[in-house]
Amino acid sequence: MKERIKGRKNFPTDEVDPENFLSDDDVRNLIKDKDNITFEQNDYYKLYNCVHCGECETEEERLLLKQKFLEDGNKVDGLEDMIECFRKYRTPYPSNKMRIRRPEGIPDESDTLFYMGCLSTIRIPRYTERSLKYLLNQKVDFTILEKEICCGWPWFASGCNEEFEICKKENIEIFEEFKTVICLCPACYFLFNKYYKPSMKSTTEFKYISDYLKPSDIKKSGKVGVQHLCQLMNRGRKGVDKRVNNILSKSGYEVVEIPHWCCGGGLGYMHRTDVIEKVANKRMSDFDKAGGDYSTTYCPSCWWILARYSKLCKISPKAKDLFELLI
């Protein structure tokens, strides 16, 4: 596999945590022999090394190995607390209260639902408010829910199949009432299309918010580096990076070329946070080296990483989400 960044491995966790990295062949061999294996607590470091960027060919098999790790009686720090929050609030957080301020102009009823996600509405509300304002500015007809149920990604990516199935069942009952569901988060978009749709009675269409992006009507300027989305590009949406870059260029920005690499946020900030931080720090160095005025993205998890680590790493480009750059 050709290196996209000279001297760096394409698989992010192989780059930052090579002693615990499992290759595709390693994973396939474990799957073949899993009925004869009993995982021990120390296997956590290898099995939860993955940040779920979708770069490898064995993402689903890695999830099965996590399920077996838990079934074998092992523990993951913080997971029980997350599950308790889920039982109470249907989110991985100790609340299901949205922290967003609902902009005027969103109708109470529509055949299109904008599903924002737990991270977006609870942890990064300003990012989410700007996405709402952007859709309103584009005259998109949509509504939002008073409260959302987690899409299931934290449980799916942790190996907790029971909790994921609950999310799936309860959300399907809601989504079947809509013709279209616009997703703000690529993990939600992935789960809804691949795992929800086959179980749905309706013909609900799931779209990603990048499908609604257009060049700004106001002429913009400045150099922009973009963190494109592993969870779209590695899961069947090749070309979205070129489309977004083209929109920025037509808006007046100069797009700074930065070879694609994971930001570390694909899993969310949980479990092997030491690995996530190492990946994030390396990615911030890419933006700093490339220079420019702004660093941007159109993924909530990437934005959480970019907003946080651009400050911690004191990189030169200022972090601004794509909606802010285009409004």
Predicted features along the sequence, with ranges:
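Short, structured interface segments
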Residues: 66-69, 202-214
